[in-house]
Amino acid sequence: MESLKEMRKAQMSEGPAAILAIGTATPNNVYMQADYPDYYFRMTKSEHMTELKDKFRTLCEKSMIRKRHMCFSEEFLKANPEVSKHMGKSLNARQDIAVVETPRLGNEAAVKAIKEWGQPKSSITHLIFCSSAGVDMPGADYQLTRILGLNPSVKRMMVYQQGCYAGGTVLRLAKDLAENNKGSRVLVVCSELTAPTFRGPSPDAVDSLVGQALFADGAAALVVGADPDSSIERALYYLVSASQMLLPDSDGAIEGHIREEGLTVHLKKDVPALFSANIDTPLVEAFKPLGISDWNSIFWIAHPGGPAILDQIEEKLGLKEDKLRASKHVMSEYGNMSSSCVLFVLDEMRSRSLQDGKSTTGEGLDWGVLFGFGPGLTVETVVLRSVPIEA
């Protein structure tokens, strides 16, 4: 028994998991939000729906978004007209693009993360790949392993259909892997596309317009490991704790269903109110061990699900106007990229902290929170510790 305890102890790291590198990628096709209503209704042959187009234009104007990136091209939509219909039977066409583009975009982000990390990709021991697009067997984790040229013995985990909160999920999983497998280095990749969800408008499904106004494509990758070797590695953030919570009375608030028509997403109007009404519970539980209850004393990495969610979080917690600056910037420049979005915010936080001459990667603060929100309603809460920025 003693030898088993020794073996178990030998497998565990000495310290907490750390984020060692971040990389991001977006498709080349850029759509300006101001022009998108005209483009969307033209491509879906819905210009006769003038009242619906006015509603959509209002949604876009209030979205906080300046531009978005999507893998869909005008040529693809013209060649696959069923995709542009509201409920056209188009799953095959969507799958054909998603199973290729999901790992390809993820690879772009992973290459950047590994380059920043500075170590050989053969040192990657685990791979977590997350996406709500292109369900296939073998999955995007397998495809990325081949494209990137990872060791064939890399331990893979594929996380499908979790939605917008999963940026926090993959960090929680990576933390557990890194801290319980001494010397491991975990490559985390979130790659999300609108290929499954893009569809034309319908007067009978106004809630679908919200997703069409907000969602975008993007991939983010991280390298996570415990006990970084300071001679060759540098921590960006430490993952102090990670938890998940289902919010009460939120059944059916956000749902997604795979059908012959693709992935249909349904959003209830009270989603922002449900999040804001319950957000203090996971916050209090996460920061109670640290004795922190002033939410303006920490830095914020919040999934920018939409402007209403961010506004209500600010109001509920009494956050200063600049607290969600990183989230609002990512929402403006990229839109809602589902699970990868909060990792873009993390990258923006460290980059902006450096550019602004702050003393830490958390805007000069030591402690921070990463929030993922999504179907369930589910909240992922990750407590972060920043690191000093060397002058």
Swiss-Prot record:
Active-site residues annotated for this sequence: C164
The organism's place on the tree of life at top rank: Eukaryota
One GO term (biological process): flavonoid biosynthetic process
GO terms of molecular function: acridone synthase activity
Transmembrane segments: none
Catalytic reaction(s) noted: N-methylanthraniloyl-CoA + 3 malonyl-CoA + 3 H(+) = 1,3-dihydroxy-N-methylacridone + 3 CO2 + 4 CoA + H2O
Pfam family of the protein (one): Chal_sti_synt_C
Keyword terms of this UniProt record: Acyltransferase, Flavonoid biosynthesis, Transferase
EC number, UniProt record: 2.3.1.159
SUPFAM superfamilies linked to this entry: Thiolase-like (SSF53901)
Family under the similarity heading: Belongs to the thiolase-like superfamily. Chalcone/stilbene synthases family.
Protein name: Probable acridone synthase 4
Gene assigned in the entry: ACS4
